[in-house]
């Protein structure tokens, strides 16, 4: 995998979520990007059932990514995180006396993958309880694993179809003690999705937000 940036794109004025997604699709296709199937990323929230200390318990987020169908990522609120195989979901069921699934808190992003030269772009509709809450854009530069070596190129590419909505360098990279010149890993991508999902959970349901 390469360096990845995940961001939320606002719904265009006077447009629905789906209309804005379609607009982004057209912009990518005008650049010459080619569709390469679909993708999905989801996140389920768990909270500890027993806490003898009286302190608020940290939440546990269990995430899946269609790019890694045999893996499961788990991130504690504020860190740390781990990557395991799909049997981790079975383990969480067996640990239900310790971790309770927060019903109604599942968030997912589903959409279309595009390939443009060395870039992989994923435009997704972020949904919660079958209601669209926003739009996610993931851009991966597959030819590099060092953020500091390719960010300017990635930003220039994103400006070509996101315009003023082009994001700044993700904090998951700037917060690393080693700086921008350490190889990325899958947890960097999932941490960005988790940050985005946490934001959309707090948003109001958008008009015309039924997921098709």
From Swiss-Prot:
One GO cellular component term: mediator complex
Coiled coil: none
Biological processes annotated in GO: regulation of transcription by RNA polymerase II
Compartment list: Nucleus
Entry GO MF terms: transcription coactivator activity
Cited Pfam families: Med20 (PF08612)
Keywords associated with the record: Activator, Nucleus, Transcription, Transcription regulation
Membrane-traversing stretches: none
Stored InterPro entries: Mediator_Med20 (IPR013921)
Family to which this protein belongs: Belongs to the Mediator complex subunit 20 family.
UniProt cross-references to PANTHER family, sorted A to Z: MEDIATOR OF RNA POLYMERASE II TRANSCRIPTION SUBUNIT 20, UBIQUITIN SPECIFIC PROTEASE HOMOLOG 49
Role according to the record: Component of the Mediator complex, a coactivator involved in the regulated transcription of nearly all RNA polymerase II-dependent genes. Mediator functions as a bridge to convey information from gene-specific regulatory proteins to the basal RNA polymerase II transcription machinery. Mediator is recruited to promoters by direct interactions with regulatory proteins and serves as a scaffold for the assembly of a functional preinitiation complex with RNA polymerase II and the general transcription factors.
Assembly notes: Component of the Mediator complex.
Name by which UniProt lists this protein: Mediator of RNA polymerase II transcription subunit 20
Species for this entry: Danio rerio
Annotated gene: med20
């Amino acid at each position: 995998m390469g360096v990845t940036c995940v961001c939320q794109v606002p719904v265009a004025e006077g447009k629905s979520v789906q209309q804005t997604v379609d607009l982004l699709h057209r912009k990518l296709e005008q650049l010459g990007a080619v569709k390469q199937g679909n993708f999905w990323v989801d996140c389920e929230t768990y909270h500890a059932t027993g806490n003898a200390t009286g302190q608020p318990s940290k939440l546990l987020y269990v995430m899946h990514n269609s790019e890694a169908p045999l893996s499961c990522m788990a991130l504690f609120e504020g860190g740390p995180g781990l990557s395991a195989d799909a049997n981790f979901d079975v383990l969480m069921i067996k640990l239900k006396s310790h971790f309770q699934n927060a019903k109604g808190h599942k968030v997912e992003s589903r959409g279309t993958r595009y390939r443009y030269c060395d870039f992989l772009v994923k435009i997704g509709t972020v949904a919660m309880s079958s209601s669209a809450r926003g739009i996610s854009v993931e851009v991966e530069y597959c030819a590099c694993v060092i953020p500091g070596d390719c960010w300017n190129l990635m930003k220039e590419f994103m400006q070509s179809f996101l315009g003023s909505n082009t994001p700044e360098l993700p904090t998951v990279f700037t917060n690393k003690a080693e700086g921008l010149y350490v190889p990325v890993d899958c947890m960097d991508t999932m941490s960005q999705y988790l940050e985005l999902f946490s934001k959309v959970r707090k948003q109001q349901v958008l008009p015309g937000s039924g997921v098709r």
